[in-house]
Amino acid sequence: MENIQIDTNRIIGLYAPQNYGKSYFARHIINAISGHIPVFVYDTNFEADTNYASMKNVFAIHSVKKSEMETPAFFNKAILTLRAKQSNFYLVIEDIDKLIETSHKTKDTLEIFKLASDSRHQRIGIIYLTKEPSNIPVKLRSNTNLFLVGQFLEPTHLKYLGEMVDRKIIKTLKKPEFILFDRLTQVIQKVKIENNKMVEL
């Protein structure tokens, strides 16, 4: 099985159902990124300390209140502060759909869209995790370089994901397998974590 390497400064979307192992997979993606780039985790569920505790060079973005973490205002402030202090970093956003849902309700624009656009020209990488792929706006999806898709069975999500990957393949995946789709090369691979490495099946 071939060990999969991931280039730095890319935008990666992890699409998988609840309890499929997105955070587990994200940790191994971070390990696969070469160099010593600082990684900042934004987690509205306050689980970043648990999910990424053993990793070096990984820092959680915190608020005192969980409700505040789900607001676009706090997220935007955190990102602007981060950009002012760091020129080269990776940002991991757990359950980004929660932020997107709140931004739709409040009609507040999320700084993530500008960050995703700017990342092409700056040394910024993004890994976002979601269990609601059909809720990801086109302006974020269009800037995503690499997609990792877990098993989905819901027609709404399959219709959305079917534009990238064959729906039949998605339905046959078994936890914790993912389909890796590279938008730049149009290469599609089935991957999983084995012996602490991401490998092609």
Language-model-derived ranges and their functions:
Residues P17, T44, V64-K66, F152:
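Structural motif
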Residues N9, H36-I37, S87-N88:
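Short coil/turn connectors at secondary-structure junctions
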Residues M1-D7:
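Pre-Walker A adenine-sensing motif
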Residues I12-I30, F75-V165:
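Conserved P-loop NTPase motor cores
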Residues E163-L201:
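Phosphate-binding and hydrolysis-coupling loops of NTP-dependent motor/remodeling domains
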Residues F59-R83:
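Short glycine-rich substrate-engagement loop in P-loop NTPases that contacts/grips substrate
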Residues P17-F59:
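Walker A/P-loop NTP-binding active-site region of P-loop NTPases
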